[in-house]
Amino acid sequence: MCNQHQTRVLSVSHAKAKFEQTTIERRGLRPHDVLIDIKFSGICHSDIHSAFDEWGGGIFPMVPGHEIAGVVTAVGTKVTKLAVGDRVGVGCFVDSCGECEYCLNAEEQFCTKGVVQTYNSVDYDGNPTYGGYSQKIVVTDRFVVRIPDRLEMDVASPLLCAGITTYSPLKHWNVGPGKKVAIVGVGGLGHLAIQFAHAMGAEVTVLSRSMNKKEEALELGANHYFATSDPATFTALAGRFDVILNTVSANLDVDAYLSMLRIDGTLVSVGAPAKPDTYSVFSLIMGRRSIAGSLVGGIQETQEMLDFAAEHGIEPKIEVIGADQVDEAYERILRSDVRYRFVIDISTL
């Protein structure tokens, strides 16, 4: 192993602590490793859940960030598909066993040995992982994706989590021409889901609590928009959709949403509410309907998503901030005061 790489980071010392600038050591390059100078790091709501230890098991000090865009500055001796100067990205995971049925099927997120997360995780050597609120990161080459030239790096960073989180279920449930899909929520995830579903050729309906975001949703590619605060919405849309993609973290009236599915329709959730949802099993039985979830996507699919986004002009709406604004950004996210993703300019760190 070569010498370690010192890097400045933004870290929290304990749950709900303020961010501090400090220094850590990244591991030296192994044969299949890539050293990346990070240019931008997106802020995901998962970062807040983790930094506040709302899901438990937090590893502190913690360096969040799994929406990483940067440039390769060094490669290991056995790296053949990446070179110094390449524009690259790193998402939610940085390693997996590479041998189980799911890894071999390009679904590393379901690795039976346990996928290594980009931060708040432990690698196979027993060391804690630190994420993208950092100047540099060292990653196994097979977990690095290329950022297409048509995507600016700041815009690309949220796609590494928010983008693949919405693209993957739409693809898995065969959203495309002739399909009617509803997107629940017009936020960090929802505004990308609308664009992906539209580009895939589906008829897209947006479901949001109020009519406040109608104009934005239609501009993003929605064909229809309804407010779920109006009970008449559920009557008007009964039995309409092949797929409903729920992108919000609030608890829903699941039975009401299931009623809007066609026979064999599926309600897919990528938002994670703090409390369990409840529903009647008859809402499933009577229409042979399904409830499902989706966990980001594999590395091959993430690359496919980036290429698809570049080809179809799909971009997240972002607000670029400095390293000294992250605490404020967290507060603004919690009060829904962002359109729609914050991205940290790492040059300010």
Curated annotation (Swiss-Prot):
Cofactor-binding details, from the entry: Binds 2 Zn(2+) ions per subunit.
Keyword Metal-binding recorded: yes
Effect of deleting the gene: Cells lacking this gene show significantly reduced growth in the presence of formaldehyde but not methylglyoxal.
Binding site for Zn(2+) 1: 44, 66, 161
Superkingdom to which the source organism belongs: Bacteria
Pfam family of the protein (one): ADH_zinc_N
GO MF annotation list: oxidoreductase activity, acting on the CH-OH group of donors, NAD or NADP as acceptor; zinc ion binding
EC number: 1.1.1.-
Coiled-coil zones: none
Cofactor names: Zn(2+)
Residues that coordinate or bind Zn(2+) 2: 97, 100, 103, 111
Function (record text): Functions in the protection against aldehyde-stress.
Name of this protein: Probable formaldehyde dehydrogenase AdhA
Native source species: Bacillus subtilis (strain 168)
Lineage, opening ranks: Bacteria, Bacillati, Bacillota, Bacilli, Bacillales
Gene from which this protein is expressed: adhA
